[in-house]
């Protein structure tokens, strides 16, 4: 497992009985996590000091219980030096905060790969969410095309770019259905040296298009292969779906990309270290093809 263990403004303090206790800057949040199936005793005294707790509803969704007044949003930083990003945190109605902290281990990998390339790199970030990967790539010098189906989420990404001092970088922010966008890019003859995709398990595009990961992921990977440049640098696929193992994702990349480009593939879980126990909570998986 590859842990995201370089954070200073984020910390997974403890995890048990279906919940995480997290520190986001100076704010303590409790959020549900279906991966946390163990019911060990709470190891941190800070559970009782949580500033807000998210409660799931039996009807789906849920709501926040605020135990003290919190700002609507606040900022945290990730990375150091030229890789430092400033990201806006805001608790949403679906338990999320605008940042998936485990992805920081991938952001650092993308940035390192781009800096070492020694040539101009164009990156396509599909299902780009609030832009952590986009900004990591842009800070490393890449030209980035960021695509997400949610107008509000793309606006959040632009705000993160401004907060990180990257608003003037070569980033295209697009609200679009990812599969339809890739098909249009193929017709236009546009290509990319790096592709990142972080698809949801289930979702709908801006035109009501239905996305189900297991049904759609192979076709999308195959489409994306056709918009890679003649000398691509990397292709990364992230998944939070327990039914889609890292090895399955790697197999799709291996059989789709290696016959044309050579290179190598790898896969692993990513996770967050738990301060109270020294363990690591799994938070999804990443499969990578690289030159």
Explain the meaning of each model-derived region.
Residues 101-119:
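Conserved alpha-helix/loop element of class I SAM-dependent methyltransferases that forms part
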Residues 118-129:
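Conserved class I S-adenosyl-L-methionine
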Residues 128, 148-152, 216:
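Short beta->alpha hinge that forms the Motif I/post-I loop of the SAM-binding pocket
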Residues 130-144:
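Conserved SAM-binding loop of SAM-dependent methyltransferases across substrates and taxa
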Residues 150-196:
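S-adenosyl-L-methionine
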Residues 215-230:
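A short glycine-rich, Lys/Arg-flanked "PGG" loop and its adjoining helix->strand segment in the class I
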Residues 232-291:
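C-terminal catalytic and target-recognition region of SAM-dependent MTase-like enzymes
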């Amino acid at each position: 497992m590859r842990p995201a263990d370089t954070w200073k403004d984020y910390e997974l303090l403890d995890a048990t009985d279906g919940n995480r206790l997290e520190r986001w800057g100076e704010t303590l949040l409790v959020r549900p996590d279906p991966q946390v199936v163990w019911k060990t005793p709470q190891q941190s005294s800070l559970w009782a000091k949580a500033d807000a707790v998210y409660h799931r509803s039996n009807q789906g969704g849920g709501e926040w219980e605020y135990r003290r007044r919190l700002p609507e949003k606040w900022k945290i930083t990730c990375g150091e030096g030229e890789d430092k990003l400033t990201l806006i945190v805001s608790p949403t109605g679906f338990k999320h905060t605008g940042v998936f902290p485990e992805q920081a281990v991938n952001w650092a990998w993308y940035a390192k790969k781009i800096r070492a390339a020694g040539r101009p790199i164009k990156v396509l970030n599909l299902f780009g969410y609030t832009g952590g990967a986009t900004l990591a790539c842009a800070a490393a010098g890449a030209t980035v095309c960021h695509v997400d189906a949610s107008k509000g989420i793309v606006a959040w990404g632009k705000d993160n770019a401004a907060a990180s001092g990257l608003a003037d970088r070569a980033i295209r922010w697009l609200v679009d259905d990812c599969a339809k966008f890739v098909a249009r890019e193929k017709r236009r003859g546009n290509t990319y040296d790096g592709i990142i995709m972080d698809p949801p398990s289930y979702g709908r595009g801006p035109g009501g298009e239905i996305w189900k990961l297991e049904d759609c992921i192979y076709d999308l990977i195959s489409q994306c292969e056709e918009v890679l440049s003649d000398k691509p640098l990397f292709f990364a696929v992230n998944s939070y779906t327990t039914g889609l193992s890292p090895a399955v994702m790697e197999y799709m990349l291996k059989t789709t990309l290696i016959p044309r480009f050579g290179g190598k593939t790898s896969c692993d879980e990513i996770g967050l270290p738990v301060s109270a126990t020294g363990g690591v909570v799994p938070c999804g998986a990443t499969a990578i093809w690289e030159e």
